[in-house]
Structure formats: structure tokens, C-alpha cells
């Protein structure tokens, strides 16, 4: 079988990494969701021993229905979490003390999928549109308010059933996840049914790495070590996508997460594109001030933020 030898090699690598005795500083990282290729750089950094080499004993603890990543961060159960920029900014606006220590997704994977052709975001006026219950949905909601559009937002958990059943006119989706699900559900989507936010002037950064302000100030060494090792992980992913898929599938099996290689291949391919800055064509792993300002503007004008958040407040408190 194609996977057998690779899995054996990966298991051996993980065993060797776990056997390193001089990594003493234990920290916990929590992704946004269950195990999937969206977090490949972290899995690789763990499996290949990059965290151990940096002097860290990293535990990857995925969120549950009763314990989200941000809840774990607030309780001190996790020191590092992945958050999208939009909800992170809303939380800071509400008084939470968060620091962006690494921005790895430089582009937006958010899109609108519609039953009818879309000319622009304004085409959603008067429509029923599915949205995620939390997170990135705040951006299009704010944009709709800014443009004075009459959109009925219908919350969904994580599936595409509302759209497939015809209960809604359109739905928000991530190009690396829900778009694939819709295609696998038999939806024959034409180009004019797909509206990518990044193609219509709203290309905001998404997934980044966050810590609390207190942890940032008292554990700068650990923060720097974790960031550098994670960047090394993502760079390895970009250079070895096929081997990365095997590592991702291994972590999914270990956590009891169900998926298939084809779905994770799609996700990894799309996520690798999001790592690249749209103007420089490079992976910078830093929060782009221009993208940050655009996000600030949309969220403020759409009433999500009470006042603008400064770049320094976000990255260097």
C-alpha cells in the first residue's frame, strides 16, 4: 500500500522526537477546529521534532464542543491558539488581552456560493445567506451593514445541508473546506456562482497564532521558540506536501477525526496558497499592516468594532 512505509517512517520520527530528553518547557497549542490539513505546519513541527529541537515539549490539544481554544487560553490551559484575525480583533475590542505573534495565512479563503449568478457582494441584497456561527462571518456581516444591504443571515454549524436543500439562497464557505464539500455533494457550480472575497477588494488575513498579553510579556523565550519552530514546520510543509498529507492523516486518526485523503489534499493545496502574500508572493509569517488596516476599516464601518485597534496594540502591546 502507498501509505504503509510512509506511516511507519513518520511513527518512527515521532518516537524519536518524543524520546528527546532535554526538552523541558511544556506548552499547549490548540487549533481552531478538529485535526485537519489547515493546521499542517503545527503537526509537522511536532512530528518532525522541530519543537523538541527548540527546547519545547509541545502538546497539541484540539478543541471540543465544551472547551474552545479561546476558552482554554483564558483559563491558562493552552498557551498558544490559532484564531482568525477578524474574531481576534473583536475579542480585543471587547477587552480581551491577545497578542498576534505570527500571521501565517496572508490571504482570505472566505467566499460566497450562490444558487444564482453573482455580479458583486451587493447581489446578496434581499437574500437568505448561510453563515458560520462564529469567526470570519463577522466580516461579511459588517460589509453588508456598511453597504446598507438587506441580508438575512442564517447561522449553520459546519455543514452544507442548508445550501444543498435549497433552504437558503447562498452560503458563506471557505475555499479549502466547504467548497469541496459542496462539490462532493453533487453541486455543479459555475464560475459566476462563486464570489471570492479576496477578488472583490476584501482580501483580509485570516489564521494567525495568538497568546495572552501576560504570557507574551513573561515568556518571550518560549514564544520565540514556538514561532520559529512552527515557521520551520510550515516551510517543510510547502517543500514536502505529499509527506505532509501522511502526517495530517496520522494526527486525524489519533484524534478520531474522520475524513479522506482527497479532501485533505484539496485543503492542503488551498491553504498553501493562503500562506503567500498576494503582492510579494512570499511567506512572511507576519501580520501585514495594509491587510490589518483594511480589516479594521470594514469592522469599524460595519459596527463590529467600537473603535479602531492599533497595529502595535495587536502585535507589540
Where in this protein do the model-derived segments appear?
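Sec-dependent N-terminal signal peptides
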Residues: 7-17
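Long, low-complexity C-terminal extensions of enzymes
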Residues: 300-317
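Short, glycine-/small- and polar/acidic-enriched structural segments
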Residues: 25-165, 169-174, 196, 203
